[in-house]
Amino acid sequence: MSAPSVITIDGPAGAGKSTLGELLARRLGYLFFDTGVMYRALAWAVLHGAIDPEDGEAVTALARDLDIQVLPPGDAMDGRLYTVLVNGVDVTWELRHPDVERIVSITARHPAVRTVMRERQRAIGSRGRVVMVGRDIGSIVMPDAPLKIYLDASIDERARRRTDEILRRGGDADLQRIRNDMIRRDSLDRYVSAPAADACTIISDGLSPEQVVALVIARIADRCDDSQEARA
């Protein structure tokens, strides 16, 4: 089976995009690139720089100056899927803090900010052999990607997953607060997180990560069969 050179996975927060992306990339031997961590890293820097997240000019200037690196987890044994450095500082787990969650959509919605980030994301995607996870990857960043997945789940399922994730790390999490934050973020992101017209939509409620991966692998196999028939 020959997998597509670029696979994009979009969807709302808590749908399981990062888990699917990491498992799929490992299965295929591809690079896993969660583009959302770039926006979270920027939001973290906005908070620590005491910058108004509504100030598009200031946030854009910060985005241009930041050194954001997304690296393999290395020897870390804390369950992380990747390591995120901002100007050399490991902020991986801080990016899931509720304060970051509350402003990430505000900082990311500035058009100039998204332009800066998309250019960086597109450069990585153009190398091929990559699974890219985000909200607008298939529709805007990599519109010519040969396989696009839109992963979704109910708001209750997504909030439960995010709560469980925080609790597993020993943090404090309030299910209702997380649910409300997700609803608010969905409203802010509704213009950038719509699925691409040619995306394959998967609803992950009640499915294990392995079951979702199996659905995507089946989709890849179907594409390969269609391609072989077209060449015959």
UniProtKB/Swiss-Prot annotation:
Instruction: Identify the enzyme class.
Output: transferase
Coiled-coil region: none
Statement: the UniProt record of this protein carries the keyword Transferase: yes
Report the EC code(s) recorded for this entry. Answer: 2.7.4.25
Annotated GO molecular function terms are: ATP binding; CMP kinase activity; dCMP kinase activity
- Which Gene Ontology BP annotations are present? pyrimidine nucleotide metabolic process
CDD domains on file:
CMPK
Q: What is this protein called?
A: Cytidylate kinase
Origin organism is Roseiflexus castenholzii (strain DSM 13941 / HLO8)
Q: What is the lineage of its organism?
A: Bacteria, Bacillati, Chloroflexota, Chloroflexia, Chloroflexales
What gene does this protein come from? cmk
